[in-house]
Every structure is written in C-alpha cells, then in structure tokens.
Amino acid sequence: MTSLVSLENVSVSFGQRRVLSDVSLELSPGKILTLLGPNGAGKSTLVRVVLGLVAPDEGVIKHNGQLRIGYVPQKLYLDTTLPLTVNRFLRLRPGTQKTDILPALKRVQAGHLIDAPMQKLSGGETQRVLLARALLNRPQLLVLDEPTQGVDVNGQVALYDLIDQLRRELDCAVLMVSHDLHLVMAKTDEVLCLNHHICCSGAPEVVSMHPEFISMFGPRGAEQLGIYRHHHNHRHDLQGRIVLRRGNGHS
C-alpha cells in the first residue's frame, strides 16, 4: 500500500533542545495511527512536521502529491462575547460554499446544530463541528489532536464510532493524538508511544470480550475502546535521559 505521508529517521531541535529524535512512521489510506505520550514528549511538534509546518533538521519526510488534509485542533478559543453560530463559524473557512455546510454537519450527526451558538456547545458537540469543518476539505489525511479531551466516556465511544465510519467512507488515513496513555480507540491499526523518540509501538489489546471491561463501559464501549500495553525497554529520568530497564521492560 502506498503511504500518503512517511517520516524516516526525523529529528527536530529548537536551539540546543532536541525535541524529536530519529522518528519514523507511515500514514496510509484507510489506516488509523494513534500517537501517545506524556506532556512535553514532542507530540505537537510531530503533528506540525506531518502538516508541513515544521521542517526536520535531520531525516526525510515524503508527501504523496497534493495531499488534502483535514485538521481538528486540540482546543478552540472563541471570544464568549462574539455572537457566532455554527453556520457562520464554518463559513469562515476559506472556499466554503453555503451549500456544503449542512451536508458536512449531517455527516457527523450534527445537522441540528447549524444555528446553535458556538459558545453554548458541549465538548462533544464542539468536536463534531470541528470534525465537520475538517471534512469540508475532502481530506485524504485526517489529523485529530486529542479529540476526546473534555469528552466523557460515552462521548468518546460515539466519537470513535464516527471516526471509524468516516475513515471507511473516505478511505482516508487518520493520525490521532491521545492524552490517555492506555485507553485508545480499539480499531486503531498502530499505536506509537512517543517521548522525544519512539519508545514502543504496537496494536491495542482486544478486550471486547472481557466481562470486567464490558461491565465498566457497556457492550458498545467495549467494542470501541481498547487497552494499549506498553513494552518499553527503558525509562526517562528527570533530565529526559534514557535509562535501560532490567527484565522484560513491560509497563
């Protein structure tokens, strides 16, 4: 399968500080890659590299032609005194046609919000509106920066279900950044754990049949949520230096 974006041994420094070191990844059509890591691990910098906003100091980044990207930011800051409906907010995007707005909202099950004030939306509703905005670009790559932040578990399940539906309909690649180091979208194809470098990678554990998991999240939640078990052979000290572990290194 031809990748839409590939990074090969990419490193980025800001001044004397190395933020990313020797990072490689591939984003392919129809595949979901989830990026995990603690605060300050370089996740946002890596996203900016993928988006073409930061050039690597070392390594190679390859894009597949004129790549169409849809981006959902981590947070949306709006002036609470500014009267702005969902309709008007989406029309602020350059090139957006009025006739495109309602179909995009309906695609994310948010058509009923078209005349709602942006400031009155819940966390989950805001994420759906931002996702609709990203879809206006007919993306080949969908980048979601911590889309479940501020969303409860039921909202996460619904959002993951929607993301899975969209990636199948659009056959787009999905890069999802998560603040949760263990609970991820079950249908993620690959998980990367980043702490300035790739600490480990793998697929989420299938837990949908575990009775304890089902009792906690319900059958639908168990289908959409997965556990990622890290397998580091090292840890990072307070200065960020790598310290090798003894034994099997599972965490």
Curated annotation (Swiss-Prot):
Keyword Transmembrane part of the UniProt annotation: no
Subcellular location: Cell inner membrane
Reactions catalysed, as given in the entry: Zn(2+)(out) + ATP(in) + H2O(in) = Zn(2+)(in) + ADP(in) + phosphate(in) + H(+)(in)
Membrane topology: Peripheral membrane protein
GO molecular function list: ABC-type zinc transporter activity; ATP binding; ATP hydrolysis activity; ATPase-coupled transmembrane transporter activity
Positions bound to ATP: G37, P38, N39, G40, A41, G42, K43, S44
Domain ABC transporter: 5-220
Enzymatic class: translocase
InterPro entries reported for this sequence: AAA+_ATPase, ABC_transporter-like_ATP-bd, Metal_Ion_Import_ABC, P-loop_NTPase
Keywords for the protein's UniProt record, in alphabetical order: ATP-binding, Cell inner membrane, Cell membrane, Ion transport, Membrane, Nucleotide-binding, Translocase, Transport, Zinc, Zinc transport
Gene Ontology process terms (BP): response to zinc ion
Single GO cellular component term: ATP-binding cassette (ABC) transporter complex
Keyword presence, Translocase: yes
Subunit structure: The complex is composed of two ATP-binding proteins (ZnuC), two transmembrane proteins (ZnuB) and a solute-binding protein (ZnuA).
Family stated for the protein in its record: Belongs to the ABC transporter superfamily. Zinc importer (TC 3.A.1.15.5) family.
UniProt xrefs under NCBIfam families: PRK09544.1
Protein name (database record): Zinc import ATP-binding protein ZnuC
